[in-house]
């Protein structure tokens, strides 16, 4: 099991909670920065804040993983994700101490990806200005490609469907 975290604090909380409840530690940790696609584990104001960028939070998560390793005698690899695009990006992240990288968006348009051809073509046709931060159905910021559907949501003409599985929930206690 490999949870996605966005801070050293989150990594520590998950590891300690899993250990106390299940007597199990994560097999690895994915630390995802705010440049990722899809749902983001950050508030809107944190997305461009240098204190929350992958290069800043990665060392914090690595430090927590090392402390867990010392405490329990088990290495937890740290995998970096979010905004990693090129070989140079991979090199920089690995030099910061990551055990590996996770790249998702980079491979969406490949033959091996099972997304629909229409979805893939949307990626291929997109320009930088088409990428927007939206409020997802669970209340979290998300990075998405602008579309007519997104425009209708912004205008209040459409509402995203609620996920019946409740697999992602907002941490906003006011809701």
Give the location of each predicted region.
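Conserved active-site-proximal phosphate/metal-binding subdomains
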Residues: 26, 36-79, 85-175
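Conserved alpha/beta-domain cores
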Residues: 1-48
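Short catalytic-loop micro-motif centered on adjacent basic/acidic residues
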Residues: 2-3, 78-80
């Amino acid at each position: 099991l490999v949870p996605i975290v966005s801070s050293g604090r989150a990594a520590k909380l998950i590891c300690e909670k899993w250990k106390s409840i299940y007597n199990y530690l994560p097999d690895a940790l994915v630390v995802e920065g705010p440049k990722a696609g899809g749902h983001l584990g950050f508030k809107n104001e944190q997305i461009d804040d240098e204190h929350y960028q992958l290069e800043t939070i990665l060392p914090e998560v690595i430090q927590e993983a090392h402390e867990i390793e010392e405490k329990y005698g088990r290495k937890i690899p740290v995998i970096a994700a979010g905004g990693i695009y090129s070989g140079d990006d991979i090199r920089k992240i690995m030099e910061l101490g990551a055990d590996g990288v996770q790249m998702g968006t980079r491979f969406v348009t490949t033959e091996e990806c099972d997304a629909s051809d229409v979805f893939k073509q949307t990626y291929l046709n997109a320009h930088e200005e088409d990428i927007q931060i939206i409020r997802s159905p669970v209340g979290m910021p998300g990075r998405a490609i602008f579309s007519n559907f997104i425009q209708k949501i912004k205008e209040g003409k459409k509402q995203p469907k609620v996920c019946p599985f409740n697999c992602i929930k907002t941490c906003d206690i006011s809701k």
